[in-house]
Amino acid sequence: MTKEKANESPLACNLGAMTVKQRERHRTLGRELRESVAEIRELPEGFEFLLPSKAWAMAAEFVALERLCCPFVRFRLDLKEEGGPCRLTLTGREGVKEFLRLELGLTARLPL
């Protein structure tokens, strides 16, 4: 086993990594973000969510909390110029995409 593999966290949410207050906020943010999503794109290693520009701060706060319980997910928040939409990308190593598909309820295949 390589040193990198030995340091990988398991593909499982660790909600114990957050306080009760953080979990409540995480749940609220997740619900609000899901309601804000304009489009979901399936990527080879994960998913991309198109959000209105006003959702960037909410997305950033969500990522900060999500990283506590799911450190194996790679996050990218892209803010377009001129107040354009923002994109939240969730990707990761092998197995992360299927984990995200199940956790986010994306059971149907999306067009690549």
For the regions a protein language model found, what residue spans apply to each?
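Long, contiguous binding/interaction regions
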Residues: 2-45, 72, 94-112
